[in-house]
Structures are given as C-alpha cells and as structure tokens.
C-alpha cells in the first residue's frame, strides 16, 4: 500500500476535519482520480510519434493509455473527425496513490527552473491541473531512448467543494505550491 494513502487516512483526514469543522469523516475531501493527457498533434503526419507517446505514457502511469480521437473536423489544423491525436490515462485507487507519491517526491523536483506550482490552477471546484513541459522528469523514461521531448497535462480531481479545500488537501501532502 502506498505511504501517502496511509498518511492521508491517519493524519490528513484529522487535520482537515479540524480545520474546516466537518461533522463527519466522509465530508473530508479526498483525491478521486488523476488524469494524464498527452496531446500529439504531429501524429497526423507520423503515426510512429503517437506510438512513442503511448509507450511513454504507459511507462509513466503503469497502465495502457487510451488513444484519443478528434471529435470534429477542423480545416485550419487539417484534422478530420476520428483521427488519433493524443492519448490519456485515468488513474484511480492504488496506482493513483503510487503515481501521486512519485509525482511529489521525484518528478516535480526534477523540473528545470522549478519555483513552485501555481496556486491559481484550481478550477473553482477544488480540482488542480498542471502542465509538464518534458516527460523526461519521470524516472521511468529513459533519456537516451526519447525521440522527442513531449509535455503532458496532469489533472488531480478531488471531492473538495471549493478551491480553498482542494488547496488545503494538496498542501497537507506537502504539494510544492509557490509561496
């Protein structure tokens, strides 16, 4: 079992319950899922780029990504409906906690020129989204085998009702927010 999951149950729940005066433990916000998305617009010309992106995302997340397809045709981007244009993974349960732990302890500190994550990236409902410019910050990616440096979007979906609660939840895990 992931250390952060135990830490959440033993420590964070009690801290947040006291801070926000919840009457029940079930009111305390928790992390519901983490979604990783990698858009590969260049996949229109070279299918191998999408295969490499899928392999990278599979290595990072530990499960097979879903290839996303264009919802509608856009002439300006030369995209037709149904073209594969990216891949995504939704992590829940044990894999989610393991990824979250690796993200906080290993990956985020390896970001170049890192000064903390922006606190304004909450969506108004307690969910946090962040972008990573290089997939090579994750230790599962072998730098020598990378054909192209790609970015990815990471969305942490919580059961928090407000941004303040969501930020308190992530801050309780020592999430590296900008001061």
Curated annotation (Swiss-Prot):
SUPFAM superfamilies (UniProt xref): RL5-like (SSF55282)
UniProt keyword annotation of Phosphoprotein present: no
A Gene Ontology BP annotation from the UniProt entry: translation
GO cellular component: ribonucleoprotein complex; ribosome
Entry keyword set: Ribonucleoprotein, Ribosomal protein, RNA-binding, rRNA-binding, tRNA-binding
Record-linked Pfam families: Ribosomal_L5, Ribosomal_L5_C
Gene Ontology molecular-function annotations: rRNA binding; structural constituent of ribosome; tRNA binding
NCBIfam families for this protein: PRK00010.1
Quaternary state and interactors: Part of the 50S ribosomal subunit; part of the 5S rRNA/L5/L18/L25 subcomplex. Contacts the 5S rRNA and the P site tRNA. Forms a bridge to the 30S subunit in the 70S ribosome.
Function: This is one of the proteins that bind and probably mediate the attachment of the 5S RNA into the large ribosomal subunit, where it forms part of the central protuberance. In the 70S ribosome it contacts protein S13 of the 30S subunit (bridge B1b), connecting the 2 subunits; this bridge is implicated in subunit movement. Contacts the P site tRNA; the 5S rRNA and some of its associated proteins might help stabilize positioning of ribosome-bound tRNAs.
Similarity comment: Belongs to the universal ribosomal protein uL5 family.
Family annotation (HAMAP family): Ribosomal_uL5_B (MF_01333_B)
Listed name of the protein: Large ribosomal subunit protein uL5
Organism of derivation: Histophilus somni (strain 2336) (Haemophilus somnus)
Gene name for this UniProt entry: rplE
């Amino acid at each position: 079992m992931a250390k952060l999951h135990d830490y959440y149950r033993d420590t964070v729940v009690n801290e947040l319950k006291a801070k926000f005066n919840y009457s029940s433990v079930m009111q305390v916000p928790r992390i519901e899922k983490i979604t990783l998305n990698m858009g590969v617009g260049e996949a229109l010309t070279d299918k191998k780029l999408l295969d490499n992106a899928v392999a990278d995302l599979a290595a990072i997340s530990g499960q097979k990504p879903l290839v996303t397809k264009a919802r509608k045709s856009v002439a300006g981007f030369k995209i037709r409906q149904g073209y594969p244009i990216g891949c995504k993974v939704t992590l829940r349960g044990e894999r989610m906690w393991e990824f979250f732990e690796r993200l906080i302890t290993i990956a985020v500190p390896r970001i170049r020129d890192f000064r903390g994550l922006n606190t304004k990236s909450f969506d108004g409902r307690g969910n946090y989204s962040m972008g990573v410019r290089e997939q090579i910050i994750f230790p599962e990616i072998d730098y020598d085998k990378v054909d192209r440096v790609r970015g990815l979007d990471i969305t942490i979906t919580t059961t928090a009702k407000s941004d303040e609660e969501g930020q308190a939840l992530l801050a309780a895990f020592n999430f590296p927010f900008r001061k």
